[in-house]
From Swiss-Prot:
One GO cellular component, as annotated: cytosol
Domain of life: Eukaryota
One Pfam family linked to the record: RCDG1
Protein name in the entry: Uncharacterized protein C4orf46 homolog
Main location: cytoplasm
Spans annotated as Disordered: 1-50
Magnesium listed as a keyword: no
Bias (Low complexity): 20-34
The species this protein was found in: Mus musculus
UniProt keywords, alphabetically: Cytoplasm
C-alpha cells in the first residue's frame, strides 16, 4: 500500500472530469463535482475527504513546480554559459578586426 501512495504522490494530477463553466448546474447545495468529490446523497460508496483531495492536489502541484524550477535552473545555467561563449567570440572577432585594420593601414602608401 505504501508503494501505491508513492506512485500517487509522484504522478501528475489527473485533469478534472468537468469544468465549472460546463453549464451543468445543480439546484441543491453539494460539493463540486469538478474537484473529484462525491455527493454522499447521490452516489453510494466511500466519499473522498475534500481536505485530503486538496492536500493531494497541493502536493502534486508542489512536485510539478519543483521539477519546473529544476528545469528552469538548468536552462538558466546553459544561457549563462552561452552568453560567456558569445562574449569570448565577440572579443576574438574584435581582436581580428583590429589586426586586419592595422595590416591594411600598414599597406597604405605614406604621403
Amino acid at each position: 500500500m505504501a508503494d501505491s501512495e508513492e506512485f500517487r504522490a509522484s504522478s501528475p494530477p489527473p485533469p478534472p472530469p468537468s469544468s465549472p463553466s460546463s453549464g451543468a448546474s445543480s439546484s441543491s447545495l453539494s460539493m463540486p463535482v469538478s474537484l473529484g468529490w462525491r455527493d454522499p446523497s447521490r452516489s453510494p460508496g466511500p466519499t473522498v475527504d475534500p481536505l485530503e483531495q486538496v492536500e493531494l492536489q497541493i502536493g502534486d502541484a508542489a512536485f510539478s513546480l519543483t521539477k519546473l524550477l529544476e528545469a528552469t535552473s538548468a536552462v538558466s545555467a546553459q544561457v549563462e554559459e552561452l552568453a560567456l561563449k558569445c562574449t569570448e567570440n565577440a572579443r576574438f572577432l574584435k581582436t581580428w578586426r583590429d589586426l586586419l585594420k592595422e595590416g591594411y593601414d600598414s599597406l597604405k602608401p605614406d604621403n
